[in-house]
Regions:
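Catalytic Walker B motif of ABC-type/P-loop ATPase nucleotide-binding domains
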Residues: 51-54
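A short, surface-exposed alpha-helical micro-motif characterized by mixed small hydrophobic
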Residues: 92-94
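A short, proline-enriched helix->beta-strand linker immediately N-terminal to the Walker B motif
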Residues: 45-49
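Hydrophobic anchor residue at the start of the ABC signature
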Residues: 40
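Conserved ABC ATPase signature
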Residues: 26-30, 34
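H-loop/switch region of ABC-family ATPase nucleotide-binding domains
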Residues: 86-87
Protein backbone atom coordinates (compact mmCIF):
# COMPACT_ATOMS: atom_id res chain seq x y z
CA UNK A 1 0.00 0.00 0.00
CA UNK A 2 1.08 3.49 -0.69
CA UNK A 3 1.35 6.16 1.98
CA UNK A 4 -1.58 8.10 0.51
CA UNK A 5 -3.85 5.04 0.65
CA UNK A 6 -2.78 4.24 4.23
CA UNK A 7 -3.43 7.80 5.41
CA UNK A 8 -6.80 7.84 3.65
CA UNK A 9 -7.86 4.56 5.24
CA UNK A 10 -6.62 5.70 8.65
CA UNK A 11 -8.60 8.92 8.47
CA UNK A 12 -11.71 7.06 7.31
CA UNK A 13 -11.42 4.70 10.29
CA UNK A 14 -10.84 7.53 12.75
CA UNK A 15 -13.93 9.20 11.28
CA UNK A 16 -15.86 5.95 11.69
CA UNK A 17 -15.09 5.92 15.43
CA UNK A 18 -15.65 9.67 15.80
CA UNK A 19 -12.16 10.98 16.56
CA UNK A 20 -10.86 12.25 13.23
CA UNK A 21 -10.20 15.69 14.76
CA UNK A 22 -7.62 14.07 17.06
CA UNK A 23 -5.60 12.37 14.30
CA UNK A 24 -2.57 14.58 14.92
CA UNK A 25 -2.37 13.80 18.65
CA UNK A 26 -0.10 11.37 20.48
CA UNK A 27 -1.68 8.66 22.69
CA UNK A 28 -0.84 10.53 25.91
CA UNK A 29 -2.85 13.50 24.67
CA UNK A 30 -6.04 11.44 24.29
CA UNK A 31 -8.62 10.53 26.93
CA UNK A 32 -9.12 6.89 27.84
CA UNK A 33 -12.26 6.73 25.72
CA UNK A 34 -10.44 8.24 22.75
CA UNK A 35 -7.57 5.78 23.17
CA UNK A 36 -10.04 2.90 23.23
CA UNK A 37 -11.67 4.18 20.03
CA UNK A 38 -8.23 4.36 18.39
CA UNK A 39 -7.76 0.71 19.40
CA UNK A 40 -11.08 -0.15 17.73
CA UNK A 41 -10.00 1.72 14.58
CA UNK A 42 -6.70 -0.21 14.56
CA UNK A 43 -8.64 -3.46 14.76
CA UNK A 44 -10.95 -2.38 11.95
CA UNK A 45 -7.93 -1.58 9.76
CA UNK A 46 -7.45 -5.33 9.27
CA UNK A 47 -10.97 -5.65 7.78
CA UNK A 48 -11.94 -8.37 10.29
CA UNK A 49 -15.00 -10.58 10.05
CA UNK A 50 -15.23 -10.56 13.87
CA UNK A 51 -13.84 -8.53 16.76
CA UNK A 52 -13.11 -9.60 20.33
CA UNK A 53 -13.47 -7.15 23.22
CA UNK A 54 -12.37 -7.87 26.80
CA UNK A 55 -13.97 -5.35 29.17
CA UNK A 56 -13.50 -2.44 26.73
CA UNK A 57 -14.90 0.09 29.23
CA UNK A 58 -13.47 -1.22 32.52
CA UNK A 59 -10.65 1.34 32.84
CA UNK A 60 -12.66 4.33 31.65
CA UNK A 61 -14.16 7.25 33.55
CA UNK A 62 -17.96 6.95 33.65
CA UNK A 63 -18.32 9.86 31.20
CA UNK A 64 -16.16 8.09 28.62
CA UNK A 65 -17.97 4.75 28.72
CA UNK A 66 -20.80 5.79 26.39
CA UNK A 67 -18.32 7.09 23.78
CA UNK A 68 -16.92 3.59 23.40
CA UNK A 69 -20.25 1.77 23.71
CA UNK A 70 -21.80 4.02 21.04
CA UNK A 71 -19.06 2.98 18.60
CA UNK A 72 -19.62 -0.67 19.44
CA UNK A 73 -23.40 -0.35 19.00
CA UNK A 74 -22.77 1.18 15.58
CA UNK A 75 -20.46 -1.71 14.66
CA UNK A 76 -23.15 -4.20 15.70
CA UNK A 77 -25.75 -2.34 13.63
CA UNK A 78 -23.38 -2.50 10.65
CA UNK A 79 -23.25 -6.29 11.04
CA UNK A 80 -19.89 -6.76 12.77
CA UNK A 81 -19.72 -10.03 14.67
CA UNK A 82 -18.41 -9.31 18.16
CA UNK A 83 -17.60 -11.36 21.23
CA UNK A 84 -17.65 -9.02 24.20
CA UNK A 85 -16.71 -9.66 27.81
CA UNK A 86 -18.59 -6.96 29.73
CA UNK A 87 -20.45 -5.97 32.86
CA UNK A 88 -22.39 -3.35 30.84
CA UNK A 89 -25.70 -5.19 30.84
CA UNK A 90 -27.77 -2.45 29.18
CA UNK A 91 -25.29 -2.53 26.30
CA UNK A 92 -25.44 -6.35 26.17
CA UNK A 93 -29.24 -6.25 26.16
CA UNK A 94 -29.14 -3.81 23.23
CA UNK A 95 -26.67 -5.60 20.94
CA UNK A 96 -26.30 -9.24 21.98
CA UNK A 97 -27.86 -12.19 20.22
CA UNK A 98 -26.62 -14.64 22.84
CA UNK A 99 -25.40 -14.23 26.42
CA UNK A 100 -22.98 -16.49 28.23
CA UNK A 101 -23.05 -15.64 31.93
CA UNK A 102 -19.94 -16.59 33.87
CA UNK A 103 -19.74 -17.04 37.63
CA UNK A 104 -16.50 -17.89 39.42
CA UNK A 105 -14.84 -18.86 36.14
CA UNK A 106 -17.58 -21.23 35.02
CA UNK A 107 -20.49 -20.91 32.62
CA UNK A 108 -23.59 -20.48 34.77
CA UNK A 109 -25.93 -19.78 31.87
CA UNK A 110 -25.86 -19.84 28.06
CA UNK A 111 -29.02 -18.41 26.53
CA UNK A 112 -30.57 -16.26 23.83
CA UNK A 113 -30.63 -12.61 24.81
CA UNK A 114 -34.41 -12.57 25.24
CA UNK A 115 -34.34 -15.59 27.55
CA UNK A 116 -31.41 -14.37 29.63
CA UNK A 117 -32.79 -10.88 30.22
CA UNK A 118 -36.44 -11.98 30.34
CA UNK A 119 -36.22 -14.97 32.65
CA UNK A 120 -32.75 -16.22 33.50
CA UNK A 121 -32.66 -19.89 34.48
CA UNK A 122 -29.86 -19.77 37.03
CA UNK A 123 -30.40 -18.26 40.45
CA UNK A 124 -26.99 -16.57 40.25
CA UNK A 125 -27.91 -14.78 36.99
CA UNK A 126 -31.22 -13.68 38.53
CA UNK A 127 -29.35 -12.21 41.53
CA UNK A 128 -26.81 -10.47 39.31
CA UNK A 129 -29.41 -8.92 37.01
CA UNK A 130 -31.60 -7.75 39.91
CA UNK A 131 -28.63 -5.80 41.30
CA UNK A 132 -27.35 -4.42 38.02
CA UNK A 133 -30.30 -3.60 35.78
CA UNK A 134 -32.38 -0.51 36.38
CA UNK A 135 -35.98 -1.34 35.57
Amino acid sequence: RGMEEAVGKSMALLMRVGIETHAHKFPGELSGGQQQRVAIARGLAMDPIAMLFDEPTSALDPEMINEVLDVMVKLAQEGMTMMVVTHEMEFARKVAHRVIFMDEGRIAEDAKKEDFFGKPRSERAQQFLSKILHH
